[in-house]
């Protein structure tokens, strides 16, 4: 298989190139199809186009999709992953809402968008990516749909999105009050609390909950691009996770809570014996 990447973000471009993936230094937008076609004599026909969590980051989706279609032949498959709105409201994933994510989709709305650009969704599945994502498979001018896709559409018809959003609001306000109450109590008792991880979603969560550096000492992170920064708004410093392991706190908030199943065993294996706090979907303290 011959692969060609399209990447306008400097660090991702450098990483792809370092790993031997030929990559164009530009974003996927108007005019990109022509630039790629210039290289097709070397790479061959476009058989597969993959856009994982890209649509939500695209400023003008109606410039993006015509370029996708312009590269496709009758047997080309366009595979995309998008955060599923149903999962967002049912799992209270409010912290996935931040400045880089411009839109969220149901399968129905994604199919309607694709249809405007001659893309037919023929299959779809729900994955655990980002707490719940639509992995869609589309081809040009297709009409047939898989049973799996139709089942997801039926599932969506059973969901009251507006009602779920209202319920989510109340749950989050309750979580906020409980978390702040817990952190204040721990501080009063002389306990130390930190955060594990500095994902982008942490900025939304910490600012909405009002968790500041008065209550949380720091966030422990392994990504060198984040170490040495602070969380906007609440001004909590980001340090390397070695700080946590050298001087373990009493409590650690798992900010990438959707990955708690991996994070908690990891820190236990590294010797951390304190307690974990999960802030979403419900406030939970894990011994």
Identify the function of each model-found stretch:
Residues 130-173:
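Flexible, glycine-/basic-rich loop-and-beta segments that form/coincide
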Residues 78-103, 107-109:
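Short, glycine-/aromatic-enriched active-site segment of Class I SAM-dependent methyltransferases
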Residues 119-130:
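Conserved S-adenosyl-L-methionine
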Residues 62-79, 268-269:
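A short glycine-rich, Lys/Arg-flanked "PGG" loop and its adjoining helix->strand segment in the class I
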Residues 1-34, 214-229:
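Class I SAM-dependent methyltransferase SAM/SAH-binding core
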Residues 75-83, 275-285:
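Conserved beta-strand signature within the Rossmann-like core of class I S-adenosyl-L-methionine
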Residues 44-50:
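A conserved beta-strand element that flanks and buttresses the S-adenosyl-L-methionine
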Residues 32-44, 241-247:
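Short amphipathic alpha-helix with an adjacent loop that forms part of the alpha/beta core around
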């Amino acid at each position: 298989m011959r692969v060609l990447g399209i990447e306008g973000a400097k660090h991702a471009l450098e990483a792809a190139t370092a790993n031997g993936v030929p990559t164009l230094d530009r974003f996927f937008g108007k005019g990109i199809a022509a630039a790629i076609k210039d290289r097709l004599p070397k790479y061959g026909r476009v058989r597969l186009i993959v856009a994982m969590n890209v649509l939500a980051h695209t400023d003008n989706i109606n410039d993006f999709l015509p370029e996708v279609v312009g590269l496709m032949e009758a047997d080309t498959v366009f595979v995309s992953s998008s955060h599923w709105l149903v999962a967002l409201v049912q799992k209270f994933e409010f912290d996935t809402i931040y400045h880089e994510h411009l839109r969220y989709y149901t399968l129905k709305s994604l199919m309607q968008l694709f249809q405007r650009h001659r893309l037919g969704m023929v299959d779809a599945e729900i994955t655990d990516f980002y707490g719940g994502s639509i992995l869609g498979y589309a081809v040009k001018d297709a009409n047939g749909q898989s049973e799996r896709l139709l089942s997801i559409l039926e599932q969506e018809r059973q969901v009251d999105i507006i009602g779920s959003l209202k319920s989510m609001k109340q749950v989050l306000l309750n979580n906020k009050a409980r978390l702040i109450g817990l952190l204040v109590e721990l501080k009063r008792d002389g306990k130390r609390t930190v955060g594990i991880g500095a994902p982008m979603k942490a900025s939304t969560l910490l600012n909405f909950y009002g968790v500041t550096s008065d209550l949380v000492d720091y966030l422990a992170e392994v990504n060198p691009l984040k170490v040495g920064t602070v969380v906007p708004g609440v001004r909590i410093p980001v340090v390397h996770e070695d700080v946590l392991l050298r001087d373990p706190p009493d409590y650690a908030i798992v900010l990438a809570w959707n990955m708690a199943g991996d994070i908690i065993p990891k820190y236990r294996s590294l010797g951390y014996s304190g307690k974990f706090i999960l802030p979403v979907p419900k406030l939970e303290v894990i011994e």
